[in-house]
Design a protein with these regions (language model features):
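An acidic/histidine-cluster motif and surrounding catalytic segment
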Residues: 1-67, 71-241
Length: 241
């Protein structure tokens, strides 16, 4: 498949997780899924459980690049991963861009090949390509054990994790490739949009959503002097497709 080919071209040794799908979700009590701020679609539930297996591996074995099967990587990613071994105090680094603005620190740490790492305070979309360290993995596992979460916007709910963002972005999902001037090598098979719309919010979920919005405003105010809300650039010349 595409991802096996891409990782082979980059010289990566990798482990392919046998991901869950909406058709083979295990039995999980409804009270677990209902603890998020809105109903999660079957595809979102499958993604959470699949990424959870990767988090378990990182927590036990060490830092790793976690990517979904439709993530396209910049050619510099292998060298950037080597450079990250010399950088401390990062627990999660998003490589991806998906069109939305993010709240990023104004200062940055160079990580090679014209790419810098900014502290990431708010994010709404994207979990197709990220680097995760054991401390970050343990925090994500601990948070997810308390109740279901959406993988989109990890920096928004995993506030104890030291999250960073690569800029310019080093990855993009296939369904967004053409938006950034890239030619998609294969057709995207993203499943999230193909699922039926979720049910109406419960009273508890409405309260959680309100609190989440209030927390977002609080973070915007707290980091307003040291951060800026902007879109992440992606440079097509960094990619081989």
């Amino acid at each position: 498949d595409f991802q096996t080919w891409q990782l082979g071209q980059m010289g990566f040794d990798f482990i392919k997780v046998d991901a869950f799908t909406p058709d083979n979700l295990p039995e999980v009590r409804n009270s677990y899924w209902n603890k998020w701020r809105r109903p999660l679609r079957p595809a979102e539930r499958a993604r959470l459980l699949s990424h959870g297996m990767a988090w378990d591996w990182v927590a036990e074995n060490g830092p790793a690049l976690i990517i979904e099967d439709d993530a396209v990587l910049a050619r510099s990613v292998p060298n950037i991963l080597e450079n990250l071994e010399q950088i401390n105090d990062i627990e999660y680094l998003s490589l991806e861009v998906r069109g939305r603005r993010k709240l990023l620190s104004k200062t940055a740490i160079p990580i090679g090949h014209g790419v810098a790492s900014h502290r990431l305070y708010l994010d709404r979309l994207g979990s197709a390509a990220y680097v995760l360290w054991p401390n970050g993995a343990k925090k994500l596992i601990r948070r997810a054990s308390k109740g279901a979460v959406s993988l989109d916007g990890i920096a928004q709910w995993a506030t104890s994790v030291k999250c960073f963002q690569a800029d310019p972005a080093c990855a993009v999902q296939l369904d967004m490739a053409t938006e950034y001037g890239l030619s998609a090598p294969i057709e995207s098979n993203s499943t999230t949009e193909k699922n039926a719309a979720p049910k109406a919010l419960t009273i508890a979920q409405t309260c959680r959503l309100f609190l989440a919005q209030a927390h977002k405003i609080w973070r915007l105010c707290r980091y307003g002097l040291v951060a800026e809300r902007r879109k992440i650039e992606l440079r097509p010349e960094f990619f081989d497709i």
